[in-house]
Amino acid sequence: MLQSFTQLGTLQQRIGNRSWGGEAQSAAGTQRGNPIWGRIEASHSEFEPGTSTTGTDYDADLWRLQAGLDMLLSETASGMLVGGLTVHYGTVKSDVSSSFGTGSIDATGYGFGGTLTWYGKNGFYVDTQAELTWFDSDLSSATLGRKLADGNNGFGYGLGIEAGQKIALHGNWSLTPQAQLSYASVAFDSFTDPYGALVSNGSSDSLIGRLGLSADYESEWKGSAGQTSRSHVYGIANLYYDFLDGTDVDVSGTRLTSKPQQLWGGLGVGGSLSWADDHYSVHGELLARTSLEDFGDSHAFGGSVGFSVKW
């Protein structure tokens, strides 16, 4: 369940559209300046693992607030290199059902991270991310009517790389094929439940690959004061695949495993709007995903909205 908090988003979800066609603002057609930005995301997911020792199904309701500062590190005739620092805070709540009963997990996560992004003059980009997250979790059993753990500590981290190429089409239209690879790992402190069972961390890692294609439409105009405004709307289709074997925990010497359905598909729509010569901008995205192995059994939907101010 904590894995859902450590999964990294896309460049577009994080900061919206920083690279524009038309009259380029820089060698890379990318907004100059050092933006301060923030965004909030929320999602609801339901999971039926492909295999599970205990027949566990669970859902996850997540919200997360993220903020950051980006700075131009280098600019050449071929493109721009932008670095960033981020902080995040949020919660995730999960209701769990298995052959042994039902329960819930409530977790709070907070942490920080860093980003490094290359915007090429030819429309090519590469984005890298790293995040560290600390967790505080409460585990309860509805079947037993009591808490199993209170304030259990955990730690997770995520690493990711994304690359894409904007391909100009007729007029204001373009296509952006893109690929992303994200690794996440989560661990929690061992604890003993009220009945003396020792619960300890096994492995909880994921390596998710994403192939996506977005269709983009951009426009720009000048207001009465002569300042430029821009808009960008897009639709995106994604395929996801988890290359690893899921999670496992040890309960008093018994290994319990859960392996997710590995192949997923998703569709999304979103957009960005900037004004006052790109000093201010807002962006957002809505996204739905489902497992393609047992279509609809595992699914997720969510959205994010953000803003940035350039100084």
Language model: regions and residue ranges:
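Membrane translocator/pore-forming domains, dominated by Gram-negative outer-membrane beta-barrels
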Residues: 5, 30-35, 39-311
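Long, low-complexity repeat tracts used as extracellular stalks/passenger repeats
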Residues: 1-14, 18, 34-36
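A short, compositionally biased domain-edge/stem linker segment
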Residues: 16-27
